[in-house]
Regions:
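Bacterial Sec-dependent N-terminal signal peptides
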Residues: 2-33, 144, 240, 261-272
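Short, surface-exposed loop/turn motifs at beta-strand boundaries within globular domains
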Residues: 18, 45, 137-139
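Beta-strand secondary-structure signal
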Residues: 22-26, 51, 88, 130-132, ...
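Structural motif
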Residues: 27-44, 145-153
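Tryptophan-paired
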Residues: 41-101, 153-241, 266-272
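Acidic, serine/threonine- and glycine-rich low-complexity intrinsically disordered segments
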Residues: 110-190
Length: 272
């Protein structure tokens, strides 16, 4: 489905009447893992949304938004006028996306795996009607694995970062919507009394340059009281990299180790 973000109506107009051409984009991912299928999947998880923002002379002329319910998901089609265009494309499985085409941002209530690319192109009558487009991962993943025994009463695991990014500037691909709100997950009751099974992954939008943040990882009971916590300083994050911490949370004096996931861009390990 397409929506105009300017007063340039391209819908229901024949290409030859407007000096325009229908262009279909075949969207793929480039992140050192299996490439997108037509269901747009990465690391075994399907993307849920795809946006294409079409700009002419720095003005947005149309937005195409697809969801995973569309039969042509991953192959959006645009009617593009002849001349120079800038296209910005985002694919994500983030939660509750909020698109602002004035500020050119997408902000999610929960960040998940997300891919982006932006490029310039010139459309003529000779332009191929199908174009392949490769997107790049623009998230960091912070994974925390708890190795020691989970005590009775543990209900949630809470990660509270000093800095976290919930949005992307879809023109530049840079992170936006900085926040320090905590992110929590429920601990399954079947995990109580077990060791080495509790792990949680948290995603943030990131740029290509490494940055750091402090965070607190806490276990809470059903009354929201803290059972145990650990503070980690200077956790290194960057796009297309998984930063992995593992160690003891409930044992006194426990330390956490750190790694970078080799299934993503590179490999790295730390201790807390």
């Amino acid at each position: 489905m397409a929506a105009s973000c300017e007063k340039v109506a391209l819908d229901d107009v024949q290409g030859d009447e407007l000096n325009a051409k229908n262009i279909r984009l075949n969207v793929n991912g480039d992140f050192g893992a299996p490439t997108f299928t037509r269901t747009l999947s990465a690391d075994g998880h399907d993307m849920t949304d795809l946006w294409v923002f079409d700009y002419v002379d720095d003005e947005c002329v149309q937005v195409v938004h697809q969801t995973d319910e569309d039969v042509d998901f991953g192959t959006p089609e645009l009617l593009m006028t002849f001349g120079a265009h800038s296209l910005y494309i985002v694919a994500s499985r983030g939660v509750n996306p909020d698109v602002d085409d004035v500020e050119h941002t997408i902000v999610w209530s929960g960040v998940r795996d997300t891919f982006w690319n932006g490029f310039d192109c010139v459309v003529t009558s000779e332009t191929a009607s199908e174009q392949d487009v490769t997107l790049n991962r623009v998230v960091s993943k912070l994974k925390c694995s708890v190795n020691d025994k989970i005590p009775d009463g543990t209900a949630t695991l809470l990660m509270e970062p000093e800095c976290w990014y919930y949005g992307i500037d879809y023109v530049t691909g840079e992170p936006t919507a900085e926040d320090d709100a905590g992110i929590s997950i429920n601990v399954p009751s079947s995990y109580i009394g077990t060791s080495g099974v509790l792990a949680a992954s948290f995603y943030t939008i990131s740029g290509a340059d490494e940055w750091t943040t402090d965070f607190t990882l806490s276990a809470k009971n059903g009354n929201n009281s803290v059972i145990s916590s650990v503070v980690v300083e200077n956790a290194p994050l960057k796009a297309n990299r998984a930063t992995i911490y593992s160690g003891n949370l409930f044992s006194s004096g426990g330390m956490f180790t750190f790694t970078l996931d080799s299934e993503w861009m590179s490999d790295k390990v730390l201790t807390w």
